[in-house]
C-alpha cells in the first residue's frame, strides 16, 4: 500500500517507519508499508543567536553551539563533532549539518519567501522568472535522501603534510538529509533550452568579495533523471534554514557540495562552463607539482576545466575507535566493534570496505549497511514529495561499515587501516595526492594504536580542535609524512630536520657599535630620527623624503622602540632595505629602559586633551557603532576621549589602528593604516570605511579586517598618527614630504575602499566655494553595489554644476544589464580621455588595489607624466 507523510513531529518519534503510530497533521497513520524507512532524528531548531555571531553580518542566524568553527567567527564554516554526527544515524538533523559559507548569509524574511524569484535565462527559447510559490505549485515535488560532502573533507591531513590554500576540515565535512523539491530538469524544460546549450550555470544570492557565488554543471547531467539533480526547499521535512540556502537551493547528488548552490536565484543555460570567479578559483585539484606561488603567478592553471571537481571520489573514515579513546585490556570484552562511514560519487555504490591491522599486508571485509536502499521499497510521499527511489539504481548516500575485531589482535597491532572501493573498482589509495587547494583527500584512513601498559590508546590522523592527531605528532618529531610509512622512521633512518624559518637580516655587516640610551635620545629628533627595531638602532634621516608613508612616519618613530608596528606593517622588501640605515645596537639596559618608557605613554594631566592623535604614542578610542554599507563593507565609528576633542588628522593623511590578533597565541597585535571618511573638523568621533576581506579556499582573508569585523561594540581600538607624505592645505596648495607646491587640478584614480583618501581631498575642494581646483575622479569597481560613497559623489558633481569643478566617472567590470555607465577596467583609453595633457600644475592621486596602482602608473608614465606629479597613497 502507498503512504503519505507530510509533516512529522520530531519529539519522541522512532527513527524508522514500521507499524507504529505517528501523528501527521491531525491524521493518524496506523498501517504503513512494510519497508523499514529511516526518518530524521529528533531535531531542535536553535532559537537564539550565539554571542559570537551577534556582531557579524549573520546576527540574524541562530546556530547550534556544538558545531566546530573552522575559519574563526565569520564567515561560518563548521563541521559537527565526528562522533555526534555518526550517533545521529543515517540522517543528520539540520542543526548538526556541516556548513560551508563564503560570506554573509542572505537575510530572507518569512514574508519575502512567497515572492522569491528564480530566473532561467541564457540559451533558451523562453526565458522565464518563477516565484517560489510557482515552483511549489506548478511542478512535481520529489523527496530523496542525499549525502552532501565538502570537497575539503579530511583536508587537515593535507595541511599537516604541507599547507594548502584551503582551511582545515576534519573528517566530518559531510551530512545526509531528506531533501524535498522539484527536479531541476522540469524547471529547465519550462524555458526550452536551445540545441547548442551544454551547461547549466547557477548563481546564488550571497553577495561576496568576488560577486555572487556561482558554478556550473553539464546540462545533460541536469536532464538525466537517474542523477536526481533537484531544487530543494525542504530538508528533513522542515523549510530550509538560513545556513542551508533558505528558501531555495540546488542539490546535486554524488557531486561535491560546492556544486549545490544555496540561496538560488539564477539558472543560466550556456554553451561553456561558468566564468564565475568561484567556479574558476575554487573546487579544483591542480597537478600535485603546482605550488601555491605557481598557481598565483599563472592563472591559466585555474582556467583549465580538466582540473575542475565534479563527482566525489571514493572515501571512508573510522569513527570508532574514537580519537583519544582508550581500551583497558584487562576489562575489555573479547571483541571490539570498529565502525565508520564510506561514500562514493557519481551515483556509484560502495561495494567493499576493508580493514587491515598489519600495515596493509592482509585485509578483512567489513559489514556494510545501505540504509538508502530501504527507501527503494517504499511507495508514497514524504513531506509533500514523492519518493521515487524504487526504479533508481544510483546511490546518493553514505553507507555505514562495521567489523568485530578480536581485542587480542588490536593489542598486537600498531594501527587500524580503512579503505573502500566502489562499483567502478575505484579504490582509496595508500598515499595522499597533495594539491594546492587540499581537496578530495582520500588516502587510507589510519587509526594509530599504542599499547600503554595494558591500555590501548587510539589516535586519528588529525584533531580538528587541536594538534593531537598522530600526523601532527609525527611531524613535530621530525618524521617525514611522505615517506610511504605514515611518517614513521625505518630502522636506521635519521629524523627529518624541520625547515628553518628564514628571517630577513636587517643588520649591516661589520657594524659593532654599541649605543646607550643617552646617545640614542640625543640623536632622536625630527631632523635626525633614530629609532629601534629588535634592539638594533637605525638612522632614518636619509629616507625622510623617500618613505612611501611620508617623513612623518619616520619622525613619529624617532626615539622609540618601533619594533611592533614596523614588523607588523612592513613587507620583506622593506626589511631588506634596513641594513642601509643600521648604525648599531642599543645596549641591554638601555633597551629595557626604552621599552618601559614606551609602555608608559599615559598622559598624567587631568586636563582633557584638545587633540586626539599623537605621532609617538598610541591613544585609545572606543568602537561605538558599526554601519553596514554593503554585505562586506562597514563604517566603523570610534568615539574619542571626549565629545569636544578633535581628531587631529590633516586632509589626505592616515591614522594607524591597532587591535589584538584573535588568532595569535602570544598576545600579538595587528596594525594597519586607514583614512577616515568623516569631516576633518568633526569632534568627538571618527568614521572609518572598511571592506571586510573574508577567507576563501584560495584566499586567506584580510587579517586586520576580519579581526575588526569580530570586535563587539565597546571594544577599545588604539590609534596613532598622523602618517603620510601628502597633505592638502587649501585652494590648490599641497604639501609633499613637507614641501609646498601649487596645483590647478587633480586627476583622482581609485578603486574599492581606495576611494577614502582621495574622497577627503575632493570634499575639501568642493566644500570651499573659493577653491577653484578642478577634480576628475576615475572610480573603478566590479558591481554597482561596490561603488562606495556614491551619494556623496553625486552631490559633489551636482554642486559643481556647469563649472566643471568636479567630474566623476564610474567604470564597472561586472555591471548588470541595467548599468548604463562605462564598462571595463581603468585602462589607457580612460586615463588618456580624462587625465588630459601632462603638466606641472596637475597632480594625479591614486589609491586602490596593488594591481590597479601598478597598471595605472605604467600607463601614466607611458603618456608622459612625471613621477613627481604622481602620488600613491
UniProtKB/Swiss-Prot annotation:
Cofactor note: Binds 1 FAD.
Cited Gene3D superfamilies: 2.60.40.650, Cytochrome b5-like heme/steroid binding domain, Nucleotide-binding domain of ferredoxin-NADP reductase (FNR) module, Oxidoreductase, molybdopterin-binding domain, Translation factors
UniProt binding sites for NADP(+): 843-852
Biological processes annotated in GO: anaerobic respiration; nitrate assimilation; nitric oxide biosynthetic process
Binding-site list for Mo-molybdopterin: 150
A GO MF label: molybdenum ion binding
Domain of life: Eukaryota
E.C. designation(s): 1.7.1.3
Region (Disordered): 30-61
Entry annotated with the keyword rRNA processing: no
Pfam families linked to this entry: Cyt-b5, FAD_binding_6, Mo-co_dimer, NAD_binding_1, Oxidored_molyb
Reaction catalyzed: nitrite + NADP(+) + H2O = nitrate + NADPH + H(+)
Stretches assigned to the FAD-binding FR-type domain: 616-729
UniProt entry keywords in alphabetical sequence: Disulfide bond, FAD, Flavoprotein, Heme, Iron, Metal-binding, Molybdenum, NADP, Nitrate assimilation, Oxidoreductase
Record: residues binding FAD: 672-675, 689-693, 703-705, 756
Swiss-Prot/TrEMBL cofactor(s): FAD; heme; Mo-molybdopterin
Domain named Cytochrome b5 heme-binding: residues: 512-587
UniProt similarity note: Belongs to the nitrate reductase family.
The protein's assembly and partners: Homodimer.
Role according to the record: Nitrate reductase is a key enzyme involved in the first step of nitrate assimilation in plants, fungi and bacteria.
Name of the protein described by the UniProt record: Nitrate reductase [NADPH]
Organism: Emericella nidulans (strain FGSC A4 / ATCC 38163 / CBS 112.46 / NRRL 194 / M139) (Aspergillus nidulans)
Gene: niaD
Amino acid at each position: 500500500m502507498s503512504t503519505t507523510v507530510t509533516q512529522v513531529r520530531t519529539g519522541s518519534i522512532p527513527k524508522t517507519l514500521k507499524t507504529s503510530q505517528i501523528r501527521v497533521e491531525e491524521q493518524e497513520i496506523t498501517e504503513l508499508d512494510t519497508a523499514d524507512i529511516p526518518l530524521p532524528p529528533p531535531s531542535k531548531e536553535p532559537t537564539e543567536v550565539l554571542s559570537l555571531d551577534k556582531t557579524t553580518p549573520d546576527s540574524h542566524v541562530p546556530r547550534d553551539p556544538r558545531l566546530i568553527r573552522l575559519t574563526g567567527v565569520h564567515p561560518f564554516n563548521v563541521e559537527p563533532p565526528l562522533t555526534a554526527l555518526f550517533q545521529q544515524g543515517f540522517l543528520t538533523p539540520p542543526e548538526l549539518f556541516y556548513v560551508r559559507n563564503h560570506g554573509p548569509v542572505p537575510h530572507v524574511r518569512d514574508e519575502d519567501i512567497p515572492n522569491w524569484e528564480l530566473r532561467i535565462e541564457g540559451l533558451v527559447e523562453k526565458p522565464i522568472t518563477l516565484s517560489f510559490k510557482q515552483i511549489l505549485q506548478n511542478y512535481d515535488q520529489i523527496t530523496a535522501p542525499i549525502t552532501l560532502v565538502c570537497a575539503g573533507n579530511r583536508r587537515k591531513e593535507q595541511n599537516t603534510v604541507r599547507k594548502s590554500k584551503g582551511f582545515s576540515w576534519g573528517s566530518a565535512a559531510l551530512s545526509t538529509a531528506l531533501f524535498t523539491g522539484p527536479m531541476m530538469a522540469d524547471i529547465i524544460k519550462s524555458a526550452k533550452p536551445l540545441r547548442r546549450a551544454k551547461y547549466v550555470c547557477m548563481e546564488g544570492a550571497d553577495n561576496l568579495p568576488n560577486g555572487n557565488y556561482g558554478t556550473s554543471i553539464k546540462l545533460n547531467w541536469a536532464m538525466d533523471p537517474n542523477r536526481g539533480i533537484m531544487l530543494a526547499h525542504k530538508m528533513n521535512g522542515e523549510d530550509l534554514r538560513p545556513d542551508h540556502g533558505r528558501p531555495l537551493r540546488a542539490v546535486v547528488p554524488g557531486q561535491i557540495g560546492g556544486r549545490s548552490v544555496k540561496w538560488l536565484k539564477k539558472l543560466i543555460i550556456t554553451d561553456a562552463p561558468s566564468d564565475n570567479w568561484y567556479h574558476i578559483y575554487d573546487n579544483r585539484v591542480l597537478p600535485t607539482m603546482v605550488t601555491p606561488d605557481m598557481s598565483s603567478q599563472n592563472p591559466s592553471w585555474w582556467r583549465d576545466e580538466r582540473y575542475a571537481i565534479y563527482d566525489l571520489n571514493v572515501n571512508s573514515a573510522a569513527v570508532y575507535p574514537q580519537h583519544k579513546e582508550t581500551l583497558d585490556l584487562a576489562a575489555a570484552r573479547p571483541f571490539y566493534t570498529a565502525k565508520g562511514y564510506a561514500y562514493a560519487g557519481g551515483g556509484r555504490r560502495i561495494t567493499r570496505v576493508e580493514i587491515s591491522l598489519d600495515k596493509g599486508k592482509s585485509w578483512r571485509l567489513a559489514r556494510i549497511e545501505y540504509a538508502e536502499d530501504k527507501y527503494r521499497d517504499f511507495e508514497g510521499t514524504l513531506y509533500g514529495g514523492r519518493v521515487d527511489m524504487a526504479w533508481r539504481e544510483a546511490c546518493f548516500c553514505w553507507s555505514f561499515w562495521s567489523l568485530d575485531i578480536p581485542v587480542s589482535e588490536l593489542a598486537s597491532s600498531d594501527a587500524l587501516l580503512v579503505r573502500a572501493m566502489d562499483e567502478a573498482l575505484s579504490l582509496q589509495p595508500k598515499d595522499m595526492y597533495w594539491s594546492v587547494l587540499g581537496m578530495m583527500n582520500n588516502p587510507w584512513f589510519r587509526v594509530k594504536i599504542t599499547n600503554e601498559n595494558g591500555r590501548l590508546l587510539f589516535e586519528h590522523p588529525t584533531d580538528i580542535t587541536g594538534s593531537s592527531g598522530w600526523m601532527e605528532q609525527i611531524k613535530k618529531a621530525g618524521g617525514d609524512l611522505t615517506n610511504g610509512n605514515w611518517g614513521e622512521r625505518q630502522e636506521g633512518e635519521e629524523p627529518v630536520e624541520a625547515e628553518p624559518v628564514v628571517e630577513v637580516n636587517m643588520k649591516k655587516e661589520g657594524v659593532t657599535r654599541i649605543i646607550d640610551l643617552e646617545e640614542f635620545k640625543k640623536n632622536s629628533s625630527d631632523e635626525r630620527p633614530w629609532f629601534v627595531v629588535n634592539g638594533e638602532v637605525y638612522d632614518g634621516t636619509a629616507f625622510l623624503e623617500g618613505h612611501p608613508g611620508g617623513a612623518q612616519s619616520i619622525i613619529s618613530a624617532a626615539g622609540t622602540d618601533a619594533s611592533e608596528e614596523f614588523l607588523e606593517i612592513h613587507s620583506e622588501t622593506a626589511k631588506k632595505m634596513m641594513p642601509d640605515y643600521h648604525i648599531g645596537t642599543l645596549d641591554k639596559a638601555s633597551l629595557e629602559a626604552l621599552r618601559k618608557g614606551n609602555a608608559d605613554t599615559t598622559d598624567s594631566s587631568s586636563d582633557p586633551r584638545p587633540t586626539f592623535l599623537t605621532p609617538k604614542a598610541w591613544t585609545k578610542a572606543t568602537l561605538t557603532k558599526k554601519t553596514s554599507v554593503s554585505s562586506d563593507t562597514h563604517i566603523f565609528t570610534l568615539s574619542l576621549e571626549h565629545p569636544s576633542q578633535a581628531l587631529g588628522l590633516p586632509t589626505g593623511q592616515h591614522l594607524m589602528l591597532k587591535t589584538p590578533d584573535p588568532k595569535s597565541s602570544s598576545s600579538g597585535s595587528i596594525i594597519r593604516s586607514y583614512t577616515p571618511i568623516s569631516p576633518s573638523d568633526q569632534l568627538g568621533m571618527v568614521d572609518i570605511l572598511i571592506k571586510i576581506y573574508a577567507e576563501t579556499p584560495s584566499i586567506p582573508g584580510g587579517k586586520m579586517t576580519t579581526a575588526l569585523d569580530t570586535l563587539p561594540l565597546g571594544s577599545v581600538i588604539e590609534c596613532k598618527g598622523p602618517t603620510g607624505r601628502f597633505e592638502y592645505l587649501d585652494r590648490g596648495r599641497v604639501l609633499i614630504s613637507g614641501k609646498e607646491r601649487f596645483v590647478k587640478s587633480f586627476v583622482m584614480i581609485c578603486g574599492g575602499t581606495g576611494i577614502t583618501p582621495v574622497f577627503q581631498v575632493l570634499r575639501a575642494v568642493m566644500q570651499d566655494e573659493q577653491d577653484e581646483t578642478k577634480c576628475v575622479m576615475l572610480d573603478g569597481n566590479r558591481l554597482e553595489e561596490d561603488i562606495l560613497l556614491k551619494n556623496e559623489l553625486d552631490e559633489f558633481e551636482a554642486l559643481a554644476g556647469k563649472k566643471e569643478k568636479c567630474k566623476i566617472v564610474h567604470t564597472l567590470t561586472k555591471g548588470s544589464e541595467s548599468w548604463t555607465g562605462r564598462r571595463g577596467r581603468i585602462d589607457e583609453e580612460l586615463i588618456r580621455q580624462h587625465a588630459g595633457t601632462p603638466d606641472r600644475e596637475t597632480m594625479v592621486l591614486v589609491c586602490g588595489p596593488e594591481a590597479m596602482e601598478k597598471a595605472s602608473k605604467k600607463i601614466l608614465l607611458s603618456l608622459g607624466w612625471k613621477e613627481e606629479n604622481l602620488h600613491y597613497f
